[in-house]
Amino acid sequence: DFGDEAHLELDPQIGYTAPVTLGSIHPTADIGMLRYNYVGNSDLNYNEYYFKMIFNALLHQSDSLIPSISYTNNYGGKVTSESMGKDISNWYFNVLYATPISQSDFGANASLGYSKASEEIYGSEAEDHFFDWKIGVTYAYKPMGLLAELAAMGSNLTTGGLSDTNKKGVKTAAVFTLTKSF
C-alpha cells in the first residue's frame, strides 16, 4: 500500500554490462542501480544496487538464464525508516528463465525470488523473509523498442488481517508491464 498519494511506481535504472569468460561459457555481467520512485510520495523512494549474470543460449539459441542479487540499505525509503525507527536493509535473490515462443515476437518467462530483510517487516505475521514467483508471456514491439508483459505473480506471504489494498501487493495477481529500451 503506497498510501493515498502514490498511485504510480516508476523505476529508472542505470548499469554497465560486460562480457565475461568462464571456461567455455561466455555470460554477460550486469551491475547497476535501480531507483524506486513512487510518484506523489517521494518519502517512499529508495535506491537498490544489483548484480546479474546473463547466460544466453543454454537450452537453445535464443533463451536466457539470469541469476541476480540486489541490495538496499534503505528499503521503503524514509517512510519505512521512520516507522521502524531505523533504516531497513534488504537482500533479494532471483533466478529468471526466458525463452522466445517459436520464431515470433512472443516469449515466455518464469522466475523465483527470495527476499531477506534486516527486520520482520513482511506480511501480516511479520516475517523477515519471503519467496515470490512469476510466470509470464511477453511481446516485443521492436520498431519502438517496447516490451509488453502479462504475468501471474505471487508470494508466500501471509495476508490474514491485511486490508484489501495491502493484500493486492502480495497475493497472486495478474500484472501488466510495459518496458521501453533506449
Each model region followed by its residue ranges:
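Short loop/turn motifs that connect adjacent beta-strands in outer-membrane beta-barrel proteins
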Residues: 2-4, 19-28, 41-43, 57-64, ...
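Residues that define the transmembrane beta-barrel architecture of outer-membrane proteins
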Residues: 6-10, 27, 43-49, 87-93, ...
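Hydrophobic alpha-helical segments and helix pairs
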Residues: 10-54
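Outer-membrane beta-barrel "beta-signal"
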Residues: 135, 139-141, 168-182
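Transmembrane beta-strands of outer-membrane beta-barrel pores
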Residues: 1, 18, 33-39, 55-57, ...
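Detector for outer-membrane/organellar transmembrane beta-barrel domains
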Residues: 46-124
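Transmembrane beta-strands of outer-membrane beta-barrel proteins
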Residues: 12, 27-32, 49, 63-69, ...
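Outer-membrane beta-barrel domain signature
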Residues: 1-5, 38-42, 77-86, 120-126, ...
